[in-house]
UniProtKB/Swiss-Prot annotation:
Gene of this entry: spt
Assembly information from the UniProt record: Homodimer.
Localization, UniProt: Cytoplasm; Cell inner membrane
Lineage: Bacteria, Pseudomonadati, Bdellovibrionota, Bacteriovoracia, Bacteriovoracales
Xref: SUPFAM superfamilies: PLP-dependent transferases (SSF53383)
Enzyme class: transferase
Modified residues (N6-(pyridoxal phosphate)lysine): K264
One MF annotation (Gene Ontology) recorded for this entry: pyridoxal phosphate binding
EC number: 2.3.1.50
Job description of the protein: Catalyzes the condensation of L-serine with palmitoyl-CoA (hexadecanoyl-CoA) to produce 3-oxosphinganine.
UniProt main location, coarse: cytoplasm
GO biological process: biosynthetic process; sphingolipid metabolic process
Family: Belongs to the class-II pyridoxal-phosphate-dependent aminotransferase family.
Protein name listed in UniProt: Serine palmitoyltransferase
Amino acid sequence: MKHNLQDNLQGEQMANTNSNGGKKPFSDAKIIERANLLRDNDLYFFFRAIEETEASTVTVKGKKQIMIGSNNYLGLTHHPAVKEAAIKAVEKYGTGCTGSRFLNGNLNIHEELDEKLAAYLGHEKAIVFSTGMQANLGALSAICGPKDLMLFDSENHASIIDASRLSLGTTFKYKHNDMASLEELLESNMSRFNRVIIVADGVFSMTGDILRLPEVVKLAKKYGAYVYVDDAHGLGVMGPQGRGTMAHFDVTKDVDFNMGTFSKSFASIGGVISGSKDAIDYVRHSARSFMFSASMPPAAVATVSACIDVVQNDETILNNLWSNVEFMRNGFKELGFFTYGSQTPIIPLFIGDDMKALKMTKWLESKGVFCTPVLPPAVPKGETLIRTSYMASHNREDLSTVLEVFAEAKKIFDIPNHLH
């Protein structure tokens, strides 16, 4: 049954018309109602099957598209040295580890990667998890106990929100990148808890803005709090040789825990937590998502190691990335798009209206541009955007084409130049 998309896109609850023998059917769930509305109107842009990938293009439904929705910032998924390392690892170790690192799934290359990442990030120790999500879930739920407090930015990643729910500690949000809001919570709560941990993204995934990390560090020192940075979108991109947001601000020694993922710049899957020797040893023996999950597959481990080598030895990769970012940022500015002041490879484009964003995404796809609409609740109501992101492997011809297509789209869909 088709419903009115405009009236129901925000997720109003539909009536339950199927008793299903007394069991409430999942088809009546609000999220399924919304998904069906999008499907009915041919505006469902989730789970798009990508049939082939190249340096910065993908094939969907037999049609090649310029990919500007990927987190493959360094463009290393097709780098010859990276692919060769993955293949050699499979030949030596097989396709999987079939066990937890805690027991039978700990390969020597896992430990070598731990050490390599610790040196790369500038911390005493590091430990590799199977995914970035598991790294946050495991580490945060381990270090925030019943007598502890977690203070986190209101725009943090979902994994931090879920970790706060898993932890036995108390959790409070502070306003996004608002140091006055953070200090108010620190001042009123420090004496009530054993440990206080400030948790924030290094680069925020939707708007691409950067954590005011030096100010966070200053407040942490003033009040005696720990600092935990989720640098999923900063690792490999920010700072010298892509060492991350804490290196970008030269505050590595002041960050107690640094988390990174390998599913973005490092062309693989997995996550890492780095910090002091004692802190990481504690996480190693306490993080349930680490202890009770099978370890990273050998090919994934070798891929990450090779990516670190590439970014450390070939400065043209980061130079190309930032050149492309500057080109697109200036291009969108000239076209009159509001980009939230982003200074990273994530360049969000304010659209405002949900329907307009969905229809524009469909139109862009028809013109050979793959991008991602971001709707509430991922962003505040009325601030729907199209999230674009850029890679070192993009060529200038494709990026110029993207700008030409967006120039036409802005006129067709009457996109505003600023937030309402």
